Amino acid sequence: MEEESKSLPSKDNFSEWYNELLMTAQIMDVRYPIKGVYVWYPFGFSIRKKVYNMLRNLLDVDHQETYFPMLIPKPELLKESEHIKGFEDEVYWVTHGGLSELEVPLALRPTSETAIYPMYKLWIRSHADLPLKLYQIVNTFRYETKHTRPLIRLREITSFKEAHTAHATWDDAEKQVHEAMDLYSEFFTKLAVPFIVHKRPEWDKFPGADYTMAFDTMMPDGKSLQVGTVHHLGTKFAKTYDITYEDEKGERQYVNQTCYGISERCIAAVIGIHGDNKGLVLPPNASQTQVVIIPIIFKKDDGGVKEACQKVKELLRANDIVAVIDDADERPGAKYYKWEMKGTPFRIEIGPRDIKNNSVMLVRRDGKKESIPMDGLPETVRNKLFEFQTDLLNAARDSMLARVKACETLDEAKQQIENGWATMPWCGEKACGLEMENAVNCKLLGEAHTIKGAGKCPICGKATDRIITMARSY
Ligand SMILES: Nc1ncnc2c1ncn2[C@@H]1O[C@H](COS(=O)(=O)NC(=O)[C@@H](N)CS)[C@@H](O)[C@H]1O
């Protein structure tokens, strides 16, 4: 495919840089003729594949993967009133089969509670069937009216991982909420994406949920990106869909449920947070290729360089490190540019001098360059890969936390969210919360366990130790 050789705009203009990079690095093609619907380039899809395989491996420890229908009959979708209130203006409808109008309109799943839970009713009979922990990775459809953007706000969400669990008691479901949060923490840590977990305010929780825990990360423009959510659903859906089980005493009880979702926003976060003016910077767990080997040949006789490259590639692959040799007939500099644009974590340069010293030149994507001996090469490279992932995460976390600031007044908060997040005391009343959102023109992300403090609610003046985070959001 034709590589776009255009240079990137500066990352200081994040939105322009982000859009240009998605095309130049061949992640997603935004030219599909439906708003909010985009096309994966094969390279972008290789990132998705790597990232979602990692997510599957984490889930498959104690979940089972399955697949539910995309089409949902209107009566099923409308059953849970709070849920449908939250989604009715986002649902796409299928009204015809060929030339004939359908008797019952069918919704394209915006999320799959209303497709799955009628089946859970049929599948769950006794406490022995619990806990039931299933997930699927599917496309979902939401008629988003806010600004659509590839990987961030799509109308066809192409990589929607949704897990749906059922438990005997509210506490068991609460335990599952925490297990899901631990799994998400591990997943985002492996992607070197820092996050703060906020409990969403009552008025912004998932429609039909008891409460919502959200994983929020900060994009370079200071806006928050909700990259994952975990919802405690209590018995609301169980009562609506009559999902009951027979307990040990033979009595019928409603199940308690949770659901938790991650979409391709996790990839938007990796690209946005770690990328630089030369292109993508991919943590090893997000990149199909971890090391590209570049032969440095000056004259006809390559002095054994080609052979050495082959040996290094085989050595690394034998140790589960994905290495490729770029032996195209191109100047090394042109190769560096190409692989840096694609965000490959490491480059190994091998020239006659390296052969003589029995070493290779290891260049880390962020520029760190060092000569390492051939002896123990795979072990050294593996350690360097892990070091890179840790350095990326620490740098991103430090930069995010440096931009979260405790503010005394709403004016100060308004100023602060121009380029970061503000935290302020909040009495917990919805009226005050909504007034804070209006005054600062932002979203209240909610309260975070990790953010402590005390003060007076800026609206009603009541003393409180509840601290809330405010941010501009995607
Ligand atoms: N239009 C969208 N484009 C891309 N990602 C989205 C979009 N809408 C939501 N998401 C992502 O999908 C995650 C789950 O969506 S959700 O509405 O919060 N939760 C659910 O749908 C629940 N059924 C859990 S799967 C969100 O946390 C967000 O990261």
UniProtKB/Swiss-Prot annotation:
What is recorded about the protein's domains? Consists of three domains: the N-terminal catalytic domain, the anticodon-binding domain and the C-terminal extension.
- The name on file for this protein is Proline--tRNA ligase
The organism encoding this protein is Methanocella arvoryzae (strain DSM 22066 / NBRC 105507 / MRE50)
Assembly and interaction partners: Homodimer.
Indicate where this protein resides in the cell: Cytoplasm
Q: Which GO terms describe its molecular function?
A: ATP binding; proline-tRNA ligase activity
Pfam families documented for this protein: HGTP_anticodon, ProRS-C_1, tRNA-synt_2b
Coarse class of the primary localization is: cytoplasm
Q: Which NCBIfam families match?
A: proS_fam_I
Give the family, as the similarity comment puts it: Belongs to the class-II aminoacyl-tRNA synthetase family. ProS type 3 subfamily.
This protein's UniProt keywords: Aminoacyl-tRNA synthetase, ATP-binding, Cytoplasm, Ligase, Nucleotide-binding, Protein biosynthesis
Enzyme group, top EC level? ligase
Q: Which reaction does it catalyse?
A: tRNA(Pro) + L-proline + ATP = L-prolyl-tRNA(Pro) + AMP + diphosphate
